[in-house]
Amino acid sequence: MTVLVCNDTPPAIRGMLKRWFVEPKPNVLVGTVNHRTREKTLEYIRRNAPNLGMLVLATEKNSQGFSVQQFG
């Protein structure tokens, strides 16, 4: 599972994210995507919306069972 918490998401990026994620609250997106899709999506966002603030919580195969990344 992946959770994205974003600030001021541009409409084009928000629409793209809704392909794979549901948005229970504005700018909070939750979905189950594989590692490759998640990394490609984050790369696309960083390239096309470099000023977007984003917190990413994702399940991982580590001792905690999840990872936390922050951008912007």
Predicted feature descriptions by range:
Residues T2-V22, P26-G72:
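Basic nucleic-acid-binding interfaces
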